[in-house]
Amino acid sequence: MRQMQLEKPGGLDKFKLTEVDIPQPKEDEILIKVNASSLNYHDLMCALGLIPTDDGRVLLGDAAGEVTEVGSAVQNWQVGDQVMSACFPNWIDGPPRYEFLSFIGDNQDGYATEYIAIKETAVTKMPSKWS
């Protein structure tokens, strides 16, 4: 599959298209075929090096796609479900805490990829009338 990796923070010209294997979801993860993604301001700041991220990071925190595989412990999703990314994927409920405030695309790989294996709680159901 193809994915865009940021070779090194410092500008949008630092992206490179790479070929990697389709990831296998862990027991608490789902595999998503990414149908749409977008570059938002947070992603731009990571690409420019204004928000720290690792060399080789796969950016993009906004996406929509279809569940193509579910891990053995996944209970909330089925193959074929339409999902979209959540801004704070580690904040499930309750008051915000510092450890919840991580973004996909800066401290873990994001959606600039054809497929992503991600925790089942990192996405939400896409409204049926959205395309």
Pin down the residues of each PLM region.
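Short structural boundary motif marking the start of a folded domain
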Residues: 1-4
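A short beta-to-alpha transition loop/helix N-cap that caps and shapes the active-site region
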Residues: 42, 90-95
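Short, compositionally biased
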Residues: 95-109
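Short beta-strand/turn micro-motifs composed of small residues
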Residues: 7
